[in-house]
């Protein structure tokens, strides 16, 4: 998926703002099992998934609990680091070799300060993530494992 399509899927930007944001990303490739973000670590980069699948998981009672799958077109943004300067609550791992668009969080913060359209794009992404979070977490609390996976599979369609 093209980076401009991914960006505009979240919030349509004027062409000059889109060009500025696109000019700040670079295409990278990482192998299966690579960790984009790690639990309890402050992160420095954000990613748009061009090709591939990732999962987000946390540890509970010495077990990995997967609660989100990202796929082509999704954004992997470390919101806790970006908004509060905290370590992340989850690890994000590649489930296959992936092609990603990468942007430094420091650069993203600069863009938020200097371009109101990009700042609104970031706000819109955060709003969508906040709305989606309870939907992702609820099945973890209330469903049996098989039912939970069926529900998550449904979200990926």
Question: Which sequence ranges carry the predicted segments?
Answer:
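Cyclic nucleotide-binding regulatory module and flanking cytosolic helices
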Residues: 1-27, 31, 81
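Generic anion/oxyanion-binding catalytic loop in active/binding sites
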Residues: 7, 22, 41, 97, ...
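Cyclic nucleotide-binding regulatory domains
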Residues: 9, 34-95
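Short coil/turn helix-boundary motifs
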Residues: 10, 39-40, 115, 156
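Alpha-helical structural elements of signaling/regulatory helical domains
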Residues: 13, 62, 114-117
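Polybasic "coupling" helices that flank or enter modular domains
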Residues: 93-96, 101-157
């Amino acid at each position: 998926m093209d980076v401009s399509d991914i960006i505009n899927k979240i919030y349509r930007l004027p062409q000059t703002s889109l060009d500025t944001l696109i000019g700040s990303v670079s295409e990278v490739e990482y192998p299966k099992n690579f960790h984009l973000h790690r639990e309890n670590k402050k992160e420095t980069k954000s990613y748009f998934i061009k090709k591939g699948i990732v999962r987000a998981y946390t540890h509970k009672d010495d077990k990995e609990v997967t609660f989100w799958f990202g796929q082509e077109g999704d954004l992997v943004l470390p919101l806790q680091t970006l908004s509060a300067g905290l370590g992340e609550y989850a690890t994000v791992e590649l489930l296959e070799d992936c092609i990603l668009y990468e942007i430094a969080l420091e650069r993203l913060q600069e863009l938020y300060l200097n371009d109101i359209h990009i700042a609104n794009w970031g706000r819109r992404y955060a709003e969508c993530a906040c709305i989606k979070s309870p939907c992702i977490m609820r099945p973890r609390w209330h469903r049996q494992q098989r039912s939970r996976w069926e529900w998550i599979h449904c979200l990926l369609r």
